Amino acid sequence: MSGSSARSSHLSQPVVKSVLVYRNGDPFYAGRRVVIHEKKVSSFEVFLKEVTGGVQAPFGAVRNIYTPRTGHRIRKLDQIQSGGNYVAGGQEAFKKLNYLDIGEIKKRPMEVVNTEVKPVIHSRINVSARFRKPLQEPCTIFLIANGDLINPASRLLIPRKTLNQWDHVLQMVTEKITLRSGAVHRLYTLEGKLVESGAELENGQFYVAVGRDKFKKLPYSELLFDKSTMRRPFGQKASSLPPIVGSRKSKGSGNDRHSKSTVGSSDNSSPQPLKRKGKKEDVNSEKLTKLKQNVKLKNSQETIPNSDEGIFKAGAERSETRGAAEVQEDEDTQVEVPVDQRPAEIVDEEEDGEKANKDAEQKEDFSGMNGDLEEEGGREATDAPEQVEEILDHSEQQARPARVNGGTDEENGEELQQVNNELQLVLDKERKSQGAGSGQDEADVDPQRPPRPEVKITSPEENENNQQNKDYAAVA
């Protein structure tokens, strides 16, 4: 009974197979594990569908299954063995590759480690100190454009490895300095010597960048910096700095300063406090700026000659003026002289002031006289023009109806004569009233005053006769 029950339980378990499937002709595909369950995969066609979904081959659906070594084609599901390797292909033929070695990690052989431990041997090995080795610092040069004495020099850092490539050095110089002629093709020293390779470049020196044009030999060194500090080899400090002009320290010698410091140290037994590093750097920066200013002043004094004729007199004769005759001055030559060199002129300020005072007094007297006249005979002065206007209006009114009514010219002339007589009487009265008080003063004040015009009324016929007489005279 027990044997039959074991057989029945064994037959009732489903059959499950696991295989590794590769792609046909793909040497980089490591394979895909596919599980074949008896209940789910009942036929070979269903197995092909499962492999198609698992492999996802670029050629499409899987139609054939091959063995990896010989390429034998499998046609039934029973031929597949659990744990085996197979190749899935489409309609194409089998491609023979070493599928079993795809994706396998090759293990390196283990190195034999020597288990013996040697004792430490103490020995003195002579090795040069690291600080003594020269550092590969970049080469620092200062560049000046050809013919440029105004702009300051530009600083350029060139790596040591780049010095062997001269074209690359010229390219770096072109990027640093812009020339009108274009790129930089040559480098010259300040003396005009051509630099042909990077090995000739010296650290901390000045060079002139030249393009396609020729080198312009100008006093670059005199105008930009002092010659004493120009040629100093790299890594060597200056032995002594020039004294600062105008400072108290430059007046005394170094021995005096040393003696003062020793005396001060003997007097004061207490130690002096240490100064901060920042203050020391500030003092050094101030000294450097003063030194630069002194160098510029010294260079400017060297370039400008100290002569009595000044800077406006040329030092040498020009080629254009060679052989030309000098034009001599004569009496007609006009020379502009400054104001402080002109002869003094005497100005009659007193006479002009007296004349101005007299004119002002005369004006004041005349204005006062007019004011008195207006106050005294204000009513008469205001009535006189009104009387004249009334007489004129009356005469016009009388003259118009006479003409209209057909009066004769003799009657009109008599009426005009009467009007003129009346006007003359009014003017005479006015003159007498004004001349009684200030007739003499007015004559003294303004002797050249023109007489007042007399008002005379003429008839239209007289005007026509006068016009005809003038025309006859013009024709004659």
Swiss-Prot record:
Keywords: Cell projection, Ciliopathy, Cilium biogenesis/degradation, Cytoplasm, Cytoskeleton, Deafness, Disease variant, Nephronophthisis, Neurogenesis, Non-syndromic deafness, Phosphoprotein, Repeat. The modification Phosphoserine is found at S270. Residues 261-272, 296-306 have a biased composition (Polar residues). PROSITE patterns: DC. Residues 279-289, 354-366, 446-455 have a biased composition (Basic and acidic residues). The keyword Cytoplasm applies. Residues 234-476 are annotated as: Disordered. SUPFAM superfamilies: Doublecortin (DC) (SSF89837). This is Doublecortin domain-containing protein 2. Interacts with DVL1, DVL2 and DVL3. It comes from the Eukaryota. Residues 17-100, 139-221 form the Doublecortin domain. It comes from Homo sapiens (Human).
